[in-house]
A protein has these predicted regions:
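Multi-pass membrane proteins that catalyze or facilitate reactions on polyprenyl-/lipid-phosphate substrates
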Residues: 1-200
């Protein structure tokens, strides 16, 4: 991979990460067209994607650092120091639990299907294209049928698990992590801005 190719892929990642259109899918499409993906060693491309996404993760931490710091400090204070009963905890502390619960499905499924995720199937252009179309249709359906009632403090344990399962679905090539989680959030009744914020 040349420096110019790396820059192009970085631009693709930056343009697609914060939209519900699968940055991984678009990176893989670009990698395929540029001849950078080996069918013999597809796991090398998976590793590259993991590394390139560290940059966008850092930008998310910078943008949401006040929110994340509030969640972290209140979670630690109310669960480790003061041991406050869950029902009496602050919204930020409860969000800490929701984030943990919402992360469990993708960790478990990711470990169980590690070989398939790193394999050739997730680099297949037909799989990626089909996934992009399917997600677009489902997201459009969610926008039309959603109730848009719930605020951030209304998110329940079940809601966070369902959103976590939606996130795990994004392990399929072409399905956007933010797209699936936002769609899941809309289907359970979250307001669109709340679904987007909780997704990131």
């Amino acid at each position: 991979m040349s420096l110019i190719e790396a820059v192009i892929l970085g631009i693709v990642q930056g343009l697609t990460e914060f939209l519900p259109i699968s940055s991984t899918g678009h990176l893989t499409l670009a990698g395929k067209f540029m001849g950078l993906i080996s069918d013999k060693n597809p796991e090398h491309w998976t590793s590259f994607i993991a590394v390139i996404q560290l940059g966008t993760m850092l930008s998310i931490f910078v943008y949401f650092w006040k929110d994340l710091w509030g969640i972290l400090t209140e979670f630690l204070q109310q669960n480790l120091q003061r041991r406050v009963q869950y029902s009496k905890q602050s919204t930020n502390s409860k969000l800490g639990w929701m984030i943990i619960l919402g992360t469990i499905p993708i960790v478990v499924i990711g470990l169980l299907f590690k070989d398939m995720i790193e394999g050739v199937l997730t680099k297949n252009l037909y799989v990626i294209s089909g996934s992009l179309i399917v997600l677009a249709v489902i997201l459009a359906g969610a926008e039309k049928t959603a109730k848009f009632k719930k605020n951030i403090e209304d998110i329940t344990v079940l809601d966070s698990i369902l959103i976590g399962l939606a996130q795990a679905v994004a392990l399929i090539a072409g399905l956007s992590r933010s797209g699936t989680t936002i769609t899941g959030g809309l289907f359970i009744g979250l307001k669109s801005e709340v679904a987007a914020r909780f997704s990131f």
